Amino acid sequence: MNSKCVLLLLAFTAVLTLTACSGSKNTCTTNCTTSDAIVNVTLFDTPPTGLTVLSYSLPIVGISLTPSTGTPVSIYSPTTIVPTELTRLQAESALIAMDVQVPAGTYTAINVTLATSGGIFINESTTVLNTTCGVGNVCPLAGGAATTVTIPMKLTLNSGQASWIGLDVNLNNAITMPTSTTVAADFTQANTFAATTTPRTGTPSNAFDTIGDFIGTVTALTNSSITVQNTITGQSLTAALNSGTQFDAAPSSYSNCANGGSCIAKGSVVSMDATLTTSSTLTATEIDVLDAAATDEVEGVIYPTGPLTATPVVVGMILADKISTGDNTTLGAVTTTFGTGIFLAANTSINYVIDEKNLTNSITPVGFAGSGDLLAGQQIRAHVTNVTSGTSGISATATNVLLRWSRISGSINSFAGNNFTMTGLPQYIATLNSTLIQPAAVFTYQNGTLFDGVTGTGDPNFAVGKPVAIRALFLNSNAPPFQAAKVRVP
């Protein structure tokens, strides 16, 4: 791919002031009564097809419920804009509101107010799009204008009872092509949002939903709870710790942590998995220590900008997460956010390791030992230095590289035992990774892989042709290339 095209990577950036927002509890503080009901809201994304979107930032600035009589009741109204990155939600859920008290009664619709949004896509067509986006280029996706979307639903909230609303955003349905050479996103299109109140099959008992791979810095820690704050969004989540919470750590050569339970502290950088319980609380199921102490670092999906035999190798990264210790103004800027493009230089002599997370005791993965194992579509995390902004965009030098979890969608092609194969992968993954055997093989692990929407590969709904999304290690190996920590079948 022509690296010059990444000039167009300059991220869509809403003018945001990002401060902590704890999953917006919005708990009632005045005029509250014992007759109030409790509402929780999460957001997830239908596995995408069609246009390959590498990043999409959707700022939700308000949510209300329409009662059968009377005026709408607000259940989410953040004081600052908290953007949600949609592409990761093809396999995950994001917590929007928790433990919100609202009047008991019957409601007929949920209203979602959006600020201006936008993203980054790959032009996999055979023609120039949007005047300047050449074939094979990575380009900005014109976003949807600020709007309010009303989703009809029947909802009865009972006094003292906790309820859950799952918002399913369908980015496919929001993508429009007004002409054969233009593409944009419009969230007023039909069937862009749907709402459900029934937890998906595979959700743990006594839980409404699961929150996966929430990354941030530990801001508070006790024997019974942990608070983690994401750098880009400012969102803070506080979760209970109990005897069932699993502590892991990325390899010590990356994390400087030999054992997750012993080195985690305030200031550590972690990935947290949690359940949103039917008691309207979060319980941490896994804490994966990425860094015992914070250091400048970036994470995102990558693609090659030149040969992997070059010294150093330079890959393009679409930013999905960052940690800034404050010494670098480019990395710390609020404009360095979801979708920002970074040219990442990585020498062959540095450390390349794998974040095995909850599969630590199940596998010894191979296929990520050096710069020659960098593949288009992988999600990597890297300690960085020399982060600078110039005429060609942002560049950085990687000093330590960690393979993390790609979110990839396709269709179930075949299955046998715990394994299955996928077709319909994003075109750039198939095109740019010449060694990838297709249909691509996915390995799942008993008592390791979380299934969402199905109970496992033996579930009747796990069928050939069904859409599927995975959170998986993407290895430069065909035995098999995808090691799945999570599988979602809508």
Language model segments and positions:
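Glycine- and charge-enriched low-complexity intrinsically disordered segments
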Residues: 313-315, 319, 424
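Bacterial N-terminal signal peptides that target proteins for export
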Residues: 1-8
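Hydrophobic helical h-region of N-terminal Sec-dependent signal peptides
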Residues: 8-15
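Extracellular low-complexity, Gly/Ser/Thr-rich intrinsically disordered linkers
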Residues: 420, 424-426, 443, 461-474
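C-terminal motif of bacterial Sec signal peptides marking the signal peptidase cleavage site
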Residues: 17-20
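A short, solvent-exposed, low-complexity linear motif enriched for acidic/polar residues
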Residues: 22-308, 320, 325, 332, ...
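Short, acidic Ser/Thr/Gly-rich low-complexity loop/linker segments typical of extracellular
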Residues: 240-241, 343-345, 437, 444-446
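Intrinsically disordered, low-complexity segments enriched in Gly and acidic/Ser/Thr residues
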Residues: 406-454
